[in-house]
Amino acid sequence: MKILRWLFALVMLIATTEAMAAGHSVDVYYGYNGDSRNIATFNLKIMMPSAVYVGEYKSSQWLMTGEILQNVSWSGPPPAPSVKLIGYHQNINKASCPGLPSGWNCGYYTFEVIVSAEIESYFSCPWLVIMNDSEASPGGVTYQGPDSHDTICPSVSVQPYDVSWNENYVSKSKLLTLQSTGGVVEKTLSTYLMKDGKLCDSTQMNETGGYCRWVAQMITFTASGCDKAEVSVTPNRHPITDKQLHDMVVRVDTSSMQPIDSTCRFQYILNEL
């Protein structure tokens, strides 16, 4: 199930002045260009009610089935999870790798992620495993694939959740009035995840906060831009443990000293796993 949520920002310028005995199987999508010198970095995140742990892994130059990735860093208690390649596919539909550089193709690895007993002892739902791949070519071209997810917990319904401009109530539109200066005027607006009309606070390290982080992690976000050339917005994603989803940095070129009305649109899709 998916729920589509739209947020609008109207910018107005005034021109006056169970236990986890088995491993998780995760399909990780990646981009490739046939250059064996590319460097692959794999990012792993494990989210649970009491904590969020992140790790970085790398492979040998020629990643082969059966290889266990080398752990570079891990923020949780030792040992770091074991990540083993159990299969791969190439030349799949490029739609699975959004934003591919020109001339690159799309594929996916299937990894088995085995979590240590010490972390498993804290296991309770919501529990989510997230993994992605980042490829860097010698020529300086980089591509980070989409997040892949796995869990053994029941699906989380997104029906009670929404996205808002205000952390105190659900607000789908925002009127921003700015004063012209003859230069560039900048303003930052934040968005929030809501549940049943109230703030869903991902800073809480408990079951309630865990479900907020789960839903926030599964969001697909698109900025559709603004309908006037003088207005631009840069969305900055907050860490998953913050209560904000994005900071929208709005910039308005007021050099013309003329009134400007512009609408900026942002799409949030709340996905279920």
From Swiss-Prot:
Please, which domain of life does this record's source organism belong to? Answer: Bacteria
- Identify the stretch annotated as signal peptide in this record: 1-21
* Induction behaviour: Expression is negatively regulated by H-NS and subjected to cAMP receptor protein (CRP)-mediated catabolite repression.
Gene knockout outcome: Deletion of the operon under classical laboratory conditions does not result in any major effect on E.coli capacity to form biofilms compared with the wild-type strain.
Q: Give a Pfam family name.
A: DUF2544
The answer on whether this UniProt entry bears the keyword Signal reads yes
Q: Which UniProt keywords apply?
A: Signal
Q: Which GO terms describe its cellular component?
A: cytosol
| Known function | Part of the yfcOPQRSUV fimbrial operon. Could contribute to adhesion to various surfaces in specific environmental niches. Increases adhesion to eukaryotic T24 bladder epithelial cells in the absence of fim genes.
- Other remarks on this protein: The operon is cryptic under classical laboratory conditions, but is functional when constitutively expressed.
Q: What family is it from? A: To S.typhimurium YadU.
Please state what the protein is called. Answer: Uncharacterized protein YfcO
The gene coding this protein? yfcO
